[in-house]
Amino acid sequence: MKFTGLAGLAPEGRLRLVGLILLALTGCGGPGRALPVLPSTRPAAYTLGPGDQVRIITFGEETLTGEFRVNDSGSIALPLVGAVRAAGLTSSELETSVALALRRGNLVRDPSVAAEIIAYRPIYVLGEVNKPGQYPYQPGMTVVTAVAVGGGFTYRAVEDYAAVVRTVDGSAIEGRASRQSYVQPGDVITIFERRF
């Protein structure tokens, strides 16, 4: 039998062949390739969110010093003061906010307040890593360092990129992130399984 090329096929046959080729090529993209690229972020001043734990030190005032967790509504509950908004603030902005609340309540005339983050919201590393799970966030963490914390890639892992679900302004966004993309607290990182 002699091959006559596409010219020997009826128009319907050519259309089917082109359709099969296109269908085969769509599978070549790899898992997660259709996700939009996650906007690049650089390590910036960290802003607090629910789940973070902070140490507030009011110098000379033992009863107004302690460790506090940012609750789901984004506040910390200070003794004698009540709820103070913390979500979305940096630690220095929280210092100012706590000092203002102490002045407003006539609790301390000229408060000197320090705030430090002692525990960040966790990150979640899922998919093709050796030990998927919840891990503590560390400033400056990238996708590849998060994978390392999760025990490294499995032999089936796509190692060039990952899916990241991130909460921005109260809404979850999902995108594709490179190995060197910075991770933020609360991120859910999924490593895809490679197609062989």
Describe the predicted segments one by one.
Residues K2-A10, I21, C28-F196:
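Ser/Thr/Pro/Gly-biased, low-complexity, turn-/loop-rich segments
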Residues R14-L20:
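Sec-dependent signal peptide recognition
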